[in-house]
Regions:
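Short extracytoplasmic/periplasmic juxtamembrane "stem" segments immediately C-terminal to an N-terminal membrane anchor
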Residues: 2-17
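Small/polar (Gly/Ser/Thr/Ala-rich) solvent-exposed segments
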Residues: 46-50
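Surface-exposed amphipathic alpha-helical segments in non-transmembrane regions
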Residues: 6, 19-39, 51-162, 174-227
Length: 227
């Protein structure tokens, strides 16, 4: 019966920070209505404050835009009738349903009574053929999903990343008087940004770079390149 638990949110790899934040806010809005909750803190794009349990579970590697954690603090156990375990069990169905609406995978993690472990049940697959490992991992995950009392199923299989290559139509660009270099620089400026000048502030020792680039809302996907 602890005074805290963690909600771990995993979105598909490549999800922009704003979409991950949207899921975290929705779950946070639900959590704030729970009478036994004292307060909570949300970490988007990074893991929660590291503890021994998080160290063993790989919390140090949750540095990406598709990760979020919500650390929930409960009122003292002397002031509530429900244990932290019963609270987590009661809210789990609603949080899982809410997460699925956004395509998120969530885990509700309580501090273990004994030494921390990666998970209650862990299946490890070894072999020289990674494709076969991925296939077996999917089969085992499906088996876990059918097993009673097994929740928060996850795996370490890396999602495939799409790679796009933009090819410049040099003939059309030449007819419009635009060089390939100009097109590349414009794309780079739009997505990655570019320092176009510096700002000299009287209260700062070093000059501050002025960056020019599109807002995050205008560079979330390949379709934005057509604008």
């Amino acid at each position: 019966n602890k005074n805290t638990f963690l909600v771990s949110i995993d979105m598909p790899a490549g999800t922009v920070l704003e979409n991950t934040d949207r899921v975290a806010r929705a779950i946070g809005d639900y959590i704030r209505r729970i009478p036994e909750v004292k307060d909570y803190e949300t970490f988007v794009g990074t893991g929660s404050v590291m503890d021994f349990n998080g160290l063993l579970r790989g919390g140090a590697f949750r540095e990406a835009s598709h990760f979020a954690d919500i650390r929930v603090n409960l009122i003292d156990k002397e002031e509530r009738s429900l244990s932290s375990e019963k609270i987590v069990l009661a809210i789990r169905p609603d949080i899982v349903k809410l997460a699925k609406e956004y395509g998120a995978n969530i885990k509700l993690v309580e501090d273990p009574p004994g030494p921390p472990v990666r998970a209650t049940v862990v299946a490890e697959i070894y072999g020289p053929d990674y494709a076969k490992q991925r296939e077996l991992a999917g089969d085992i995950r499906a088996l876990f999903a059918k097993t009673a009392e097994v929740v928060d199923i996850d795996d370490s299989v890396k999602e495939k990343q799409d790679k796009y290559q933009l090819v410049v139509d040099k003939e059309k660009a030449a007819l419009m008087g635009i060089s390939t270099e100009q097109i590349v620089q414009t794309l780079r400026l739009s997505v990655a940004g570019m320092a176009i000048s510096t700002l000299h502030r009287p209260d700062a020792r070093n000059p501050v770079a002025i960056m020019l680039r599109l807002s995050k809302a205008d560079r979330t996907g390949l379709a934005d390149m057509d604008k």
